[in-house]
Each structure stands twice: as structure tokens, then as C-alpha cells.
């Protein structure tokens, strides 16, 4: 046991140092069993200031109908027209007009911030930035729903820096003023990197994440930061051992909130929010707007405004040309070799589902004479950072990645994405596409798909056709045929029924001679129940998990999957 000093309690404590300084928990962190609820009525809090820009002043400036930048914001009529042109939908009352020009920030944000933005050759704010800035600068909570590569990082970070400028200075032992939660360490590092491009020398930004030694990260927190970017698991670890307090946090950001919930971080996020003062300003950004995110927003935010850039339906970037190659599993490597030859002069990212597949493709690409490296969850953090840094700098390097790199990573000038495996979830499909065609650029996305992959995930195939239609992409004839051959019934995966339409106290439907429940809820002692299924014909496949898994299409000419028997 190592004796360490806590800068917040002033007491000596014991800290169990694990592998690589990671402590006893993995990168997901524990559940914070030792974190106690805060009685905010008995806590002395530093007063916060959330209204950088008065909302009434914004509306008043919007009424001035002149085109000069000094006039401030757009008029109500101009704002409505601008939102229609950029397909922005507003949900909420008293939403301020967008800031369609950097000139609208004059006199509102610190002067250094405008200089930093113009130094990066930005000509105008992106649509999500233009609408989110006035909302956040007026102190309102925000939910932003926008596709990847739309400039969301600066969408919440520019108001955060203006927010810091009007707060009381940090004192020794204070925690951060701004906390940004990200689902993956790669995204957390990217947010930190983008933030450091626009902060001055007297504002400090730090990043803590799992998979890296805790010692340097604890030293960073001990010195003090204004902005902390963190993954939920690692922040829970530090809260659990009382190495950080969040009482000075007045601005909280949940980036890629849908991804955090998909990865099972909801308990950690709830614990962290419980340690942050209730009068905070809360910002959520997400690529989708599922029911879980709606529930989270209603719970964590007050009088919030939701802005949606584009359709609320899941959609792919229209700037990316999508191409599908129908193949068989044994021929995938041959198709990959042809694609690599076709895109030899471009930066290429290859996605696959399995870690062992990524390592195998890395070796195969090197045998073919390509410089290739693989990145996945089994790689150490320093290896992943090295590979990503080299991929950004070297256009000749081919990167093979699992879905750990599918969201949030911003690779400049990535022309081509090749999907070696078809994803199991439609969200992963869209976010793989989002790695190319960023910031208004064009890109190409190629999918190698087999009939077996499409049959295992028939619901994904149906959603895929809808995404292709909304992105104005060509739909292959065979995809339309497969979708038409799908069974007309669907399994209703009700909660409390283990997802297979059975009561928890009832036995599984393993064959036609086991008791089951019918669609109208009647108990059957002889099986053949159709609970969870719509009405079907006499020649339809009886309900069972194996019947659905091995359902065959009329056009399927592949062999039936072999079932191997293993000795017990």
C-alpha cells in the first residue's frame, strides 16, 4: 500500500496501485460504492454566473432589421429562413436566433477566443454551432442532435470558455468548472486536443481516462484544471477514492450520450451527476434521439431546448458515396485486395467486428505489401495513441479497426472507409460512414456483405434501405429482393419476458411438445405457441429461436451452417 496525500481532505490515505497504476478497477470503473449522496442544503457553494449573454438582449437585438454585423443577431424572419435552409428544427420556448457569423460573438466572448477561431481559417460557424451558441450563452440547458463531423465540440466548448470567463477564479483545492463526459478514451483525447487549440495560457484543460496510469492524471488534478474531459469509469474511480470534488462544476457536457448509454455507462453517469450541483448548466449532444436519451434529458435538465440538425431519423452523410459488394465469406479477402489496389493512393480505414479479425487483416495486408496497423480494445493505451497519431500523419498507412474507433474520431482527409464485416447494429453502420466526408468534404464507403450476414440481421437490412433512401444513395436490386423476402411477423421482445415472448416462470419453447403461451395469452400444454408473433400462414416457420436464426431466403444458395458437437 502506498501512502498518498489528498489535496481536498488534507489527510493521508491508502491507495491500492494496480497494474500500470490503474488501481483495482478496469477502464469502465466501479459503481462508486463509497460515493455518498451530497446534501446540497448543507454545502457552501461558490455563486455561479450562467447568463453570459442576456436572453432578452438577444431577442431585442434580433428585432433590429439591418444587415450590418453590429446589429447583433438575425431578425425573427431571417432566423426562420436560415433554419429552413440548414434543416434545423427547434423544440422549446423562447429559443434565441442563430449566430450565423463570427461577428455576432464580438463583445460576448473573450477577445482571445475570436482570434483563435479566425486563426484556424474558419469562415463561418457550422449550423449546429450557430444555433447552440446563443442558447448556451444565455444560460439555457441544451440537447443537440446532429450527425458526426458537424462541429459539435466547438458547439459546446466556445460557450464553456465564455462561461469560465465570468466565474470567480479557482482557488487552491477547487475542482474543475467544466466537465465533459465522453464514452471512449479516443473521443476524450480528441475533445482535449480540439479544446487546447482555442484556450489561452491561463485556462487549463485536462483529460482522464481508463487504460492509462492514474499517477500522472492525479498529478494533473492536484495542480488544478478549469476544464476536465473524462470517461465515466475513470472519473468514478477518482470520486470513489476522494481525489476530486465536483462542487465548482457549473457547466456539464455529455458528449455522444447515446453511445454512453449503449456501452452501459448510465449508472456511472447518474453517480457523477449526483456529485455536481443541481443549479448547473447541462448540455447533451447525441447523434440520435432514442427514448433513453429523451428520458435522460427530462431527468437531468431544466427548461431545455432541443435542436436537431437534419432529420430526427437516423441518417447517413449525403456527402459520402456508399457502395455494396455482394460476396461470400471465403472471397472477402480477395475483394479487399482489389479494393486496396483500387484505392492505393488514398488514406484507407478498414472496419471489422472482431479483434482477432483485425489482427489477421493487419498481417494479411502486410503480406500484400501494404503498411498496415490494427487498433482494438486489447491494445494498450500508448499503442493506440501511437497508431492513431501515425495514421493522422501518414496517408500511406492503412488502419484496421474494430468499432472502438467508429465514433467520435476525427481523421482529416480520410477518403475511403472499407467495411470488412457488416455491423450488427444500424447505429454502428451510420457512425462508420461518419469517419469520412467530414466537415463538408466528400468520401467513399464500401461494404463487403454476404447473404448470411444480411439474414442474421433482417431488421438492420430494412433500416439500411431507409437510410440509403434518405441519403439519396442507389439501392442494389438484391437488397430490395432480400427485404421483400423477410418474414411478415416479428418477435416482440417485451421486458420481463427474457426477450423471447415467454413468461419468466414458463419453460423455453425448445420443441413442439413443450408447454407455451399462445398469441392471445392462453396456456398450451402441447406447445406450438405463437406468443409474440403476428398472424401467419400455415406454412410459416413455427416460433423458436433456432427457426429465426436459421431462416433461409429463396435466393440463398449457401450451405447451411454446420453445428459442431463438442465433448463435455
Curated annotation (Swiss-Prot):
Domain named Helicase ATP-binding: residues: 133-307
Family annotation (Gene3D superfamilies): P-loop containing nucleotide triphosphate hydrolases
Cross-referenced InterPro entries: DEAD/DEAH_box_helicase_dom, Helicase_ATP-bd, Helicase_C-like, P-loop_NTPase, RNA-helicase_DEAD-box_CS
Glycoprotein in keyword set: no
Catalytic activity: ATP + H2O = ADP + phosphate + H(+)
Region called Disordered, residue ranges: 1-34
Enzyme category, top tier: hydrolase
PROSITE patterns: DEAD_ATP_HELICASE, HELICASE_ATP_BIND_1, HELICASE_CTER, Q_MOTIF
Aminoacyl-tRNA synthetase recorded as keyword: no
Subcellular location: Nucleus
GO molecular function: ATP binding; ATP hydrolysis activity; RNA binding; RNA helicase activity
EC number: 3.6.4.13
Major location (coarse): nucleus
Residue window of motif Q motif: 102-130
Compositional bias annotation for Basic and acidic residues: 23-34
Top-level division of the source organism's lineage: Eukaryota
PANTHER family, alphabetized: ATP-DEPENDENT RNA HELICASE DBP3 (PTHR47958)
Recorded family membership: Belongs to the DEAD box helicase family. DDX5/DBP2 subfamily.
Protein name: Putative DEAD-box RNA helicase HEL64
Naturally occurring in which organism (per UniProt): Trypanosoma brucei brucei
Gene symbol of the encoding locus: HEL64
